[in-house]
């Protein structure tokens, strides 16, 4: 970065390591997004085994490209680096910080047995176990890799290691985590989990080597990060019980803050990354990717996303009796069924691509409602739902989410909420704001509010009832097809 006058604005360099791409932003200390760049990387998958892996070196290359792109804008002086990443994923590294194998990402299903075993031993489930089930799987199934591994890290922690040279396990205030003795008894050496640091604290300073690789000055404070979903909560402006959000993105999901713990089958329930609150919600598998799948794989990429959504908007609510199940990669919350598959139901000659596109968009909203239904039944009350990510750029998509769920919907000023959340965490870490709630309140804004249309409630209630019944109805047939029995 070229030298600048003292009057240059102070900014945070925020790195959001998502499932399909990294987003890097320059964010002002009042929350304005001044520059954004992104770069992608592939995922290696094998549906037969449940494998889903990525190359950590590909992450670093993508980060380097994106950082250099935003730094060319010269919009300000970087005073901190904030981090978040997808998860629960696992990166195994040696003593020098080099990966000993590909990263096992959250879509990988090979460690389900280890997940259950760790849950039984610790009382923790879901995100609270981080990448530990995958680490235990590596210890049991890949002894050569395990022997070469010094540290098991989350995605955001491996970025901090690469930037500063310091291994650490970043945990939110009050976040439960298994103790080393319990891990040892299960066969996962607790010594391979780095010492804990508080998310939002300074891990270290940017090393000269990392600074040269990224094209920025050394010595910038690097702040301990968190999972992208939690960063998105911060970036969306969630502060109070009843604040909810849909993170958008490749998977889709729903999360809400509440004032007490809730036990909801099929959903995660843990502390919130804010003291005194609890977080409950679920992440789907591929609802956000379904529109792109249809646009690229089925239609051959002949339309832009905007043009396809315009066609979807030209069809009636309910897509003239067409319903879509968005389980293109199995489903996580609330079904937790990796064998689930997608389906169009009710298809006829009267349906065109606009109908199919609308059915896919409506299915993403139905999936949110499916997760939220159990949470509301357990006692939570949704005050508003903030919609984020790429889908929130579409007025149609936002309105459909309001209509289908019945929730008041708010659109944040910065849709890249994980980027914004990483910046909020980093700004707090260097003392730019007195505390995290103040930073969230001061660095997040709402630009649009949408209300559900009451005249569509009965229609979408009927659709949701059909949506819930459809998966159990066709699941036996789907399994027969997968097993070659039909």
Report the location of each language-model feature.
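Activation-segment/catalytic-loop signature of the eukaryotic protein kinase fold
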Residues: 318-411
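Acidic, glycine/GT-rich loop-and beta-edge segments that sit at the periphery of enzyme/chaperone cores
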Residues: 262, 431-486
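Active-site nucleophile and cofactor-binding loops and adjacent substrate-binding regions
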Residues: 54, 80-85, 104-107, 126-131, ...
């Amino acid at each position: 970065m070229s030298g600048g006058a003292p009057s240059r604005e102070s900014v945070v360099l925020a790195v959001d390591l998502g499932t399909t791409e990294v987003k890097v932003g320059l964010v002002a200390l009042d929350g304005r997004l001044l520059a954004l760049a992104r770069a992608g990387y592939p995922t290696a998958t094998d549906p037969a085994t449940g494998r889903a892996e990525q190359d950590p070196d590909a992450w670093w290359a993508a980060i380097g490209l994106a950082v250099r792109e935003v730094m060319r804008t010269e919009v300000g002086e970087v005073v901190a680096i904030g981090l978040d990443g997808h998860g629960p994923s696992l990166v195994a590294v040696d003593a020098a910080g080099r990966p000993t194998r590909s990263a096992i990402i959250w879509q990988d299903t090979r460690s389900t047995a280890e997940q259950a075993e760790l849950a039984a031993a610790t009382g923790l489930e879901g995100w609270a176990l981080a990448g530990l089930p995958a680490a235990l799987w590596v210890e049991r199934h890949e002894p050569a890799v395990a022997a070469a591994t010094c540290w098991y890290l989350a995605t955001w922690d491996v970025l901090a290691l690469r930037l500063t040279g310091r291994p650490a396990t970043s945990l939110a205030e009050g976040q439960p985590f298994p103790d080393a003795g319990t891990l040892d008894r299960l066969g996962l050496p607790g010594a391979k989990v780095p010492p804990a640091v508080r998310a939002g604290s300074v891990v270290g300073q940017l090393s000269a080597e990392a600074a040269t690789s990224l094209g920025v000055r050394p010595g910038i404070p690097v702040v301990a990060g968190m999972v992208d979903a939690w960063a998105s909560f911060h970036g969306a402006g969630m502060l109070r019980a009843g604040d909810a959000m849909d993170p958008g993105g490749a998977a889709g999901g729903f999360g809400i803050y509440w004032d007490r713990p809730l036990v909801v089958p099929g959903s995660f329930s843990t502390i919130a990354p804010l003291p005194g609150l609890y977080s409950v919600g679920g992440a789907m598998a591929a609802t956000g990717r379904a529109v792109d799948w249809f646009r690229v794989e089925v239609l051959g990429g002949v339309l832009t996303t905007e043009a396809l959504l315009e066609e979807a908007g030209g069809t009636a609510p309910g897509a003239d009796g067409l319903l879509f199940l968005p389980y293109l990669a199995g489903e996580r919350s609330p079904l937790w069924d990796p064998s689930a598959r997608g389906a169009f139901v009710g298809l006829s000659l009267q349906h065109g691509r606009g109908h199919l596109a609308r059915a896919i968009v409506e299915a993403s909203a139905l999936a949110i409602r499916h997760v939220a239904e159990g949470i509301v039944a357990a006692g939570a009350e949704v005050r508003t739902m903030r919609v984020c990510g790429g889908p929130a750029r579409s007025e149609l998509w936002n309105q459909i989410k309001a209509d289908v769920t019945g929730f008041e919907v708010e659109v944040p000023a910065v849709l890249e909420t994980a980027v914004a959340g990483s910046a909020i965490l980093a700004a707090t870490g260097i003392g730019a704001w007195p505390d995290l709630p103040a930073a969230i309140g001061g660095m997040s804004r709402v630009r649009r509010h949408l209300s559900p249309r009451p005249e569509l409630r009965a229609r979408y209630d009927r659709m949701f009832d059909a949506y819930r019944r459809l998966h159990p109805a066709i699941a036996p047939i789907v399994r027969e097809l997968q097993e070659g029995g039909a």
